């Protein structure tokens, strides 16, 4: 499987480095986004790469396809080997209220330990930053600001 996806292992530190390298200067000067970024940098999950799995890497509604009452995850261009909490963070951070994460994870078949919830939260925050940059780069300022507001409402900081 690693050969099929190019063997791309992505650690949280690598993800933050890539984010920082492509961060537009206007967003670099945003004190709120800087605060979230520094939180992420100071709280990088300590999860062994030996436990990494193949993850989709872009689990959002733009990549969902419903057909005959089945939900399909499409557009596997962002596939990588990473912490499985990456996809969960993207999904839960944007679509499930934090107060429902434990219940959702139990339904998913996962025991919501403090360690797992911390990792999922980290990736949820990271995904918000990624989406904010995406909206900025595509000139979607209204959507970018709405994403910042959702980040503040969901996680504070």
For every predicted segment, state its role:
Residues 35-39, 90, 103, 107, ...:
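Alpha-helical elements of Rossmann-like donor-binding domains used by nucleotide-donor carbohydrate transfer enzymes
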Residues 16-19, 101, 129:
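A general structural signal for well-ordered alpha-helical segments in protein cores
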Residues 29, 116-118, 140-144:
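Residue-level recognition of alpha-helical structural elements
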Residues 58, 63:
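Conserved catalytic-loop position in the HRD/HxD motif
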Residues 1-57, 147, 151:
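An alpha-helical support segment within catalytic cores of ATP-dependent transferases
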């Amino acid at each position: 499987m690693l050969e099929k996806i190019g063997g791309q292992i992505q650690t949280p530190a690598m993800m933050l480095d890539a984010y920082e390298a492509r961060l537009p200067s206007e967003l670099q000067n945003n004190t709120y986004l800087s605060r979230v970024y520094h939180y992420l940098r100071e709280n990088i999950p300590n999860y062994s790469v030996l436990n990494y799995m193949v993850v989709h890497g872009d689990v959002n509604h733009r990549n969902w396809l419903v057909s005959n009452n089945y939900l399909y995850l499409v557009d596997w261009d962002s596939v990588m080997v990473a912490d499985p909490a990456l996809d969960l963070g993207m999904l839960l951070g944007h679509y499930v209220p934090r107060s429902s994460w434990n219940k959702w994870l139990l339904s998913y078949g996962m025991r919501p330990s403090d360690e797992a919830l911390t990792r999922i939260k980290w990736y949820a925050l990271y995904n918000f930053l990624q989406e904010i940059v995406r909206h900025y780069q595509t000139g979607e300022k209204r959507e970018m600001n709405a994403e910042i507001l959702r980040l503040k409402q969901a996680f504070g900081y």
